[in-house]
Curated annotation (Swiss-Prot):
Location(s) in or outside the cell: Cytoplasm, Perinuclear region
GO CC annotation, single: perinuclear region of cytoplasm
Source organism per UniProt: Danio rerio
Keyword Ribonucleoprotein: no
Example GO biological process: iron-sulfur cluster assembly
Protein name: NADPH-dependent diflavin oxidoreductase 1
Keywords, in A-Z order: Cytoplasm, FAD, Flavoprotein, FMN, NADP, Oxidoreductase
E.C. designation(s): 1.18.1.-
Cofactor annotation: FAD; FMN
UniProt gene name: ndor1
Length: 595
């Protein structure tokens, strides 16, 4: 092993950047370099001045924001007091993961690259801008970028003479060693850690909130099962405002856990402790020590996700069957990504299903590889759909249950939505560990500022929270555009809106797309209400918000709004765009969309 160390630091929101960082780490090991892979916020940033070689891998979230696990690092790096030559000894490179269908494409990676240059760092390569929209997905950029990175790096930091790189099919050592206990420990509290009564819940110390209400709000004849779910947060110290989100981690189904135990011949009731094989690696903070196999598989490892390319790379190193090895190596290669997409991504085949498709290779897997093979279950976020001012000690959400068919026989289900929908408080106490995170939507403090909200479908959730909060504060200038398929089937919170309209607390404009021959969407209603909107925006300094599915709706609503500016304000197309850009810059136009 070389005396040179490559440090791979990542900022990841959904786990993709972390997976890429770990893949770079394995490539470094194969090239006989020492390596450490770490989240940016767990790394002691003051040590950066003494590092020699660092790769930064970062995603962009929301409106060009850094991921949660690099925010502390981000604030430190942009301190104005840092000297211009702080990082003059550092060789580094930045790889960004993004989606060019969003306006702030790879904004974090670009800004980080620029800041590192300002601080005197020697950039080994131009910033890598991986794109989900690329024909080959992010790997279409990542693969050639990494090829250039290793050529440059190995010329500066060559491995020791006589040490050849490890082949792709050679096994790397596991990250952790499992030590099984001969006896079951007494009285273990694996599931819920107690929350300090004086502090707010965090990802590592979530609040076990009783789920007290779970009811379908769509008509039984409607294709989509949408739930109104309520949690009791009494005694949690949780505070939140309109626009904030509630976070939680789902559990795997007992059926999937049992199936994996059978495949790998594991006893779910056995207990173990973990020791890292590298002294610089720590045991995952969310795993209790000792821990049961059942807890590991049910609460920690993401066994039902669609596996990434790295899953197949690792699996290929265990293949003894020639046909299975050939297929796994193809899936691991740059040339095989189309085939992998057809096999795995398009039909949404899960990691568990892949293991059953490769029985000989699966039989070679040992338990020590579980934490290398499967990523950790990532937290899910939901817009809070209620206000503490109207519902004290409660958090409410609107949950669309994800279920769909692909070419596979078994229907695909969303892990978190299916898990939450299955929880029934009428059959006994149900607890969901959760915490709250600040959202990207900010509502005006000025009581005179009107608020215009466009929230079709479950996109209405943050606006229900905002309207409840604003009405409780005496702010009545609220306009809501709500869209759904049918007034009788999926008009969420319809009676609540009507009550508030009757009380003079809001204006409601609806678009029921399938209740007449011509489809009517929220963007059509925005155009129809042009005079009202122009008056509120141009004369009364109104704020405009969009929330919902990121397919065509946000763009269509923006186009409709610009058409209003042109018609009612007598503007040219360019002037309308400039007005919208100005509103966005001043925080008067905000959107929160998801795919």
């Amino acid at each position: 092993m070389s005396g040179h160390t490559v440090l791979v630091l990542y900022g990841s929101q959904t786990g993709t950047a972390q997976d890429t960082a770990e893949r770079i780490g394995r490539q470094a090991q194969r090239r006989r370099l020492r390596v450490k892979v770490e989240a940016l916020d767990t790394y002691n940033v003051v040590n950066l001045i003494s590092e020699s070689l660092v790769v930064f891998v970062c995603a962009t979230t929301g409106q060009g924001d850094p991921p949660d696990n690099m925010k502390k690092f981000w604030r430190f790096l942009f301190r104005k007091s840092l000297p211009a030559d702080s990082l003059s000894r550092l060789d580094c490179a930045v790889l960004g993961l993004g989606d060019s269908s969003y306006p702030k494409f790879n904004f974090v990676a670009k800004k980080l690259h620029k800041r590192l240059l300002q601080l005197g760092a020697n950039m080994l390569l131009p910033v890598g801008l991986a794109d989900d929209q690329h024909d080959l997905g992010p790997d279409g950029v990542i693969d050639p970028w990494l090829l250039s990175f290793w050529q440059k790096t190995l010329s500066l930091y060559p491995p020791p003479a006589g040490l050849a790189p490890l082949r792709e099919e050679d096994k790397l050592p596991p990250r952790y060693i499992f030590h099984f206990l001969s006896e079951v420990p007494n009285k273990l509290t694996e599931h819920l850690q107690t929350v300090d009564n004086k502090s707010s819940p965090t990802p590592l110390r979530p609040f076990p909130a009783p789920l007290v209400f779970n009811q379908r709000v769509t008509h039984t004849a409607h294709f989509q099962d949408v739930r109104h779910i309520e949690f009791d947060i009494t005694g949690s110290n949780i505070e939140f405002s309109a626009g904030d989100t509630v976070m939680m981690r789902p559990c795997n189904t007992s059926e999937d856990v049992e199936q994996l135990c059978q495949l790998l011949k594991l006893d779910p009731e056995s207990y173990f402790t973990l020791t890292p094989t590298d002294s610089s690696t720590e045991v995952p903070a969310r795993l209790p020590q000792p821990c049961s196999i059942r807890f590991l598989l049910e609460h920690f490892l993401d066994i039902s996700a669609v596996p990434r390319r790295s899953f197949f790379e690792l699996l290929a190193t265990f293949a003894t069957d020639e046909l299975e090895q050939e297929k796994l190596l193809e899936f691991s290669s740059a040339a095989g990504q189309d085939t992998l997409h057809s096999y795995c991504n398009r039909p949404r085949r899960t990691a568990l299903e892949v293991l059953t498709d490769f029985p000989h290779t699966t039989a070679e897997l040992s338990i020590g590889r579980l934490l290398d093979l499967f990523p950790e279950i990532q937290p899910r976020s939901f817009s809070i759909a209620s206000s503490l001012l109207e519902h004290p000690n409660r958090i409410q959400i609107l949950l669309a249950v994800v279920k769909y068919k692909t070419m596979l026989v078994k229907p695909r289900k969303g892990l978190c939505s299916s898990w939450l929908a299955s929880l029934d408080p009428s059959k006994g106490d149900v607890y969901v560990p959760l915490w709250v995170k600040k959202g990207s939507l900010k509502f005006p403090q000025d009581p005179e500022s009107p608020v215009i909200m466009v929230g079709p479908g479950t996109g209405v959730a943050p606006f229900r929270s905002a309207i409840q909060e604003r009405v409780a504060q005496g702010k009545m200038a609220n306009v809501l555009f709500f869209g759904c398929r049918s007034e009788s089937k999926d008009f969420y919170c319809g009676s609540e809106w009507q009550e508030k309209v009757q009380a003079g607390q809001m204006i409601l404009v609806t678009a029921f797309s399938r209740d007449q021959e011509d489809k009517v969407y929220v963007q059509h209603r925005v155009k129809e209400q042009g005079k009202l909107l122009w008056d509120l925006i141009a004369k009364k300094n109104a704020f405009f918000y969009i929330a919902g599915n990121a397919k065509q709706m946000p763009t269509s609503v923006c186009d409709a709004l610009k058409a209003v500016f042109q018609k009612e304000g007598g503007m040219s197309e360019n002037q309308a765009q400039e007005m919208l850009d100005g509103m966005e810059k001043n925080g008067r136009f905000q959107s929160e969309t998801w795919s």
